[in-house]
């Protein structure tokens, strides 16, 4: 979690720099963006990217092709509820792009723009401010120093998080499934996806790796579960058992959730995403396909 912690703190530091101060003189991170500002970001995000998967349904399945840019929301004049100040838009844009060192290289990936970034229930989304377990009141960050601190314990135990040489595992019939909520506010789904792309590159390409490993992204879902606009109920274990014991690879996994009663969607193995077929009830997974 060392590097992911840098990513989380980096977002918080950007918000701290523009946040009003509390009665102790510390940044009131949760007030850097008002409730209206956060709602504006989510509404604009959905307008830009929701329908890319063929269904304007409050969920962004084609997240990699989402072209949302907070700078598009900068006020032309005075700040109102229908726009962001330049400082607010810049803080979001810089924070979500991820921390870079003095050489301009990413220390940790950025975060995708997704509906859960403004969550207020459970673990707060990244736009809300620092989570209770990551207290932070700094307004600047020495990324080089943070990266050096993170590298020390990893060097001592070995960087197992970057290992992609899994031929011994796969050759013995091992199967490996990854699942990650796109709105995870602790570990970036971009980072897991980066690892999976490297895994495929180092093990014969996507077609070869998909014979023993698949990666599923869950729009709107936060850290491990939850999300105010997510379908976070799915049986990954059953999919793994069917693959190992019956030889049935998971071409999709059906997801439901309390956020959208009566709705189901297929979770698709990366790089595919659920796409509406264009006909049929959009509440039903059967009317979507993995593309």
PLM region spans:
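C-terminal His-loop and adjacent cap/lid subdomain of alpha/beta-hydrolase
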Residues: 1-291
């Amino acid at each position: 979690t060392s590097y992911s912690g840098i990513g989380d703190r980096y977002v918080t530091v950007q918000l701290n720099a523009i946040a009003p101060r509390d009665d102790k003189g510390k940044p009131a991170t949760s007030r850097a963006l008002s409730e209206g500002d956060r709602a504006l970001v989510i509404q604009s995000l959905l307008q830009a990217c929701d329908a890319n998967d063929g269904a304007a349904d409050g969920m962004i399945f084609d997240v990699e092709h989402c072209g949302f840019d907070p700078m598009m929301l900068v006020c032309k004049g005075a700040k109102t509820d229908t726009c962001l100040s330049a400082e607010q838009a810049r803080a979001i844009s810089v924070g979500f792009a991820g921390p870079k060192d003095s050489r301009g290289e990413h220390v940790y990936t950025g975060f995708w723009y997704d509906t859960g970034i403004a969550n207020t229930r459970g673990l707060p989304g990244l736009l809300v401010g620092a989570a209770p377990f990551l207290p932070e009141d700094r307004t600047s960050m020495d990324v080089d120093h943070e990266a050096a601190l993170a590298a020390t314990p990893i060097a001592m135990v070995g960087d197992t998080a970057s290992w992609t040489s899994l031929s011994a595992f796969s050759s013995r019939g091992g199967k490996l499934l990854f699942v990650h909520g796109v709105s995870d506010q602790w570990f970036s789904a971009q980072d897991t996806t980066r690892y999976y792309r490297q895994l495929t590159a180092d093990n014969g390409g996507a077609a070869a790796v998909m014979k023993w490993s698949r990666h599923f992204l869950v729009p709107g879902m936060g850290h491990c579960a939850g999300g105010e606009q997510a379908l976070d109920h799915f049986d990954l274990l059953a999919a793994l058992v069917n693959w190992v014991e019956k030889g049935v690879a998971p071409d999709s996994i059906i997801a439901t959730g309390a956020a959208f009663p009566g709705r189901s969607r297929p979770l698709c193995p990366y790089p595919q995403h659920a796409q509406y077929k264009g006909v049929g009830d959009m509440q039903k997974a059967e009317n979507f396909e993995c593309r």
